[in-house]
């Protein structure tokens, strides 16, 4: 008892065993999605706990569905999610690269090299990698549509959507251009909030399009309301158009019949006042995030021959998008409504039936800063994969518009950076030069994986690529992901945004450093014995 500081079921691992375990866990995760890189990527079919099927080759989507036990493996899955949230692309590359960074560190740990020395070399290598990326990057004219389409095509080409790449590229670029907002010299592109993807099963993928406006899965609240309005005046509310219900502790004492009639009259007067506030502005269309009472419906339809079309219980996010699309302002109280709060930017409002459901369209907006991407397809699984691919494509567009610098794809950048690091390692002295040089070796995993996924000869093609990069002006030479041959990426038009590549390198190296610093894992916790619990109950 004296010699045991931990509880009996607490397990502690330390030293070399932990570091080897972490490296093996990271390598295993990297091996799972290694075949998902490049245009010849294989797809994975995953069964989720509810029995649903996920078919994808998106690194983040695969790892999100996998249940892991090892803490290092959990860290690897987390970096894929971070990459997806930060830049939206490169989720597979970052895992493969992080796994390789740890794999090359294993030999130095076996040679009794201290992890701090390896980490110091990795940090220095990361700084040099980022400097090299800036040196070899080329600026891009974001107003050149054909160039932008080429960049998006490079991102989509590795996905299931590659068959419809032209359509997908145009959809992604149009959507991002629509939500682009420039205020006081600063660009803001919020895809998550203002570019909504609506998946409607049925039809074919070629029917998909970008709507210059908003589409929501709602119908009008009364059959007599208009279902098509040209140039509508739109009012957006964030308040209920029903009589205000009392709180849970509200009591009303009624002593005679007239009191009850008076209460009902007060309710009606309150709703009458709300309706008058709205009707005063002569809107055609009313959206509210809360409910609408029956009395209010009748007022909207009857008074002064008005026929206001009302749609209730609209989501907050949808209301925000409608506001951006038509220029309206969301108001929290009807008595605060002013003429400038009315949106007049929309050209057409209509309700359409697609399949079994009704959808409301607000389109032909003059200057929409929000849009809806309508996706059609054979099944829910296909639509889910198409949406994932489109999100990646839109993120690539966003990255290029915010940071207009490009790098050649197809492993060309990795080979160029690897060559620079190898040259710089010769100037280093001491033990640090070996881990520094190992980073250069690790970078070659990207072109090597591309070659493997094509089924080409890895040794022959990689040796030729190394030889090619020793020549001048060979930065753009990489692996053609379709055939596995050497090609000039600039000629093929395969480009990657600088923001994605820089984030991939930062995340991969930082993760390798994080896992190398771990030398102790303490797992388990004290479980209460049943006797203790029973004793505790008895004592009470």
Regions from the language model: what does each represent?
Residues 1-61, 65-67, 122-385, 469-472, ...:
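Extended amphipathic alpha-helical scaffolds
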Residues 13-16, 60-66, 80-90, 116, ...:
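A short glycine/serine-rich beta->alpha loop
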Residues 20, 67-69, 370-540:
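Extended, low-charge hydrophobic alpha-helical regions
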Residues 38, 88, 112, 172, ...:
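Residue-level signature of catalytic and energy-coupling elements of molecular machines
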Residues 45-48, 94-98, 322, 415-420, ...:
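Short hydrophobic alpha-helical segments that form membrane-spanning helices or hydrophobic packing faces
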Residues 48-82, 89, 102-104:
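A helix-coil-helix interface module used to build multimeric assemblies
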Residues 85, 89-92, 107, 111-125, ...:
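Hydrophobic, well-structured modules enriched for small/aliphatic residues and gly/pro motifs
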Residues 91, 95-96, 116-123, 433-441, ...:
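Alpha-helical transmembrane segments of multi-pass membrane proteins, especially transporters
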